């Protein structure tokens, strides 16, 4: 077993000491369609043109970390449409949430939305998602990756963050951090587990450039069904459906954009900006997806259908508070996380099950 010391991110709330122990966790036999290392995102750099990035479905991501006994922002794996197959190098504890990719451990089905212990030599395999688009794999202690601009998230177009700035490939080896997270099984009560329908109504707040569209165009937007295009990715969801009529120019002086902004370019087909979206844009924005619905949107896949429902700012704020309270209640049901220990001395190190052989 390889045991290394890695400089910490210097966050005193996570670790008071200057170093943490890392060890090899997984070797990838198959990589999956798009498997990346993500955390909650990269904040404070949009003014420099750097997107927020981070997990597409923040709810599933954060719950996975809670199940694994982690701080909510520790790096985890995001798997899209079809997951990887990996061999366990050192014992660890994991949790899987999000889309059901039929995970198996040595050929036996693994429960979703629950923690699971893995031992050396185990093979954890994922297949194609039956429902939803993205699944999350958290490991106790977090996945080790260099911090770039305050985050370990992978920004694919920028080729930085995560594992060498790229998706996981066959043969890659991921490292993790030694953790003393309790070994009891954690699970999410059934009433908290989200469903992933293929037809979804997404709530939006109109603006800021709704005056660039005719009344007929706005009605078309709010009363039509749109299909997620295969040309969708972490940067944006392109939609196929009825065209939206402009009343003015199809371009504006570039201004700032946020995750969830819905642009309508010259072809009159809407584009929903997602986590890896650019930070400015020159197309008029007819509406914004409310923050609480971006997670639901992230679980839609090409061919799924969406409709838009207009709400006001007050209602959008209420929905944010609702999802925050929902997540807080869920964490209490699961149990409070346990703090990451200081770097252990020799005797303490021996207490980590399976860490020293």
What name fits each language-model region?
Residues 2-5, 14-357:
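Conserved "landmark" site that anchors the functional core of diverse proteins
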């Amino acid at each position: 077993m390889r045991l290394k010391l890695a400089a910490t991110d210097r966050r005193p709330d996570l670790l008071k000491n200057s170093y943490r122990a890392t060890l090899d966790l997984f070797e990838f036999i198959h990589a999956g369609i798009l498997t990346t290392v993500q955390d909650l995102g990269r904040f404070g750099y949009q003014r420099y043109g750097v997107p927020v990035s981070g997990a597409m479905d923040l709810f599933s991501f954060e719950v996975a970390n809670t199940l694994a006994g982690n701080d909510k922002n520790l790096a985890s794996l995001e798997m899209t449409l079809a997951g990887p197959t990996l061999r366990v190098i050192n014992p660890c504890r994991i949790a899987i949430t999000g889309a059901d990719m039929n995970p198996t451990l040595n050929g036996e089905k693994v429960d979703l939305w629950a923690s699971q212990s893995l031992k050396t030599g185990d093979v954890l395999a994922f297949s194609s998602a039956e429902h939803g688009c993205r699944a999350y794999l958290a490991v106790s202690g977090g996945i080790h990756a260099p911090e770039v601009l305050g985050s370990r998230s992978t920004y694919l177009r920028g080729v930085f963050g995560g594992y060498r700035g790229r998706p996981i490939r066959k043969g890659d080896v991921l490292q993790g951090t030694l953790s003393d997270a309790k070994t009891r099984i954690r699970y999410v009560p059934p009433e908290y587990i989200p469903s992933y329908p293929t037809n979804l109504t997404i709530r939006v707040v109109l603006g800021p450039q709704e005056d660039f569209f005719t009344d007929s165009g706005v009605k078309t937007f709010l009363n039509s069904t749109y299909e997620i295009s295969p040309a969708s990715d972490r940067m944006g969801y392109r939609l196929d459906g009825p065209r939206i009529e402009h009343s003015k120019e199809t371009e504006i002086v570039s201004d700032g954009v946020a995750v969830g902004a819905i642009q309508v370019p010259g072809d009159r087909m809407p584009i929903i900006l997602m986590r890896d979206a650019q930070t400015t844009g020159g197309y008029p924005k007819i509406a914004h997806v409310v923050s609480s619905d971006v997670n639901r949107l992230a679980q839609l896949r090409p061919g799924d259908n969406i409709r838009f429902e207009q709400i006001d700012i007050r209602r959008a704020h209420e929905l944010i508070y609702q999802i925050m309270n929902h997540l807080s209640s869920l964490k209490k049901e699961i149990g409070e996380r346990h703090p990451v220990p200081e770097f252990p001395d020799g005797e303490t190190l021996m207490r980590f099950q399976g860490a020293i052989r």
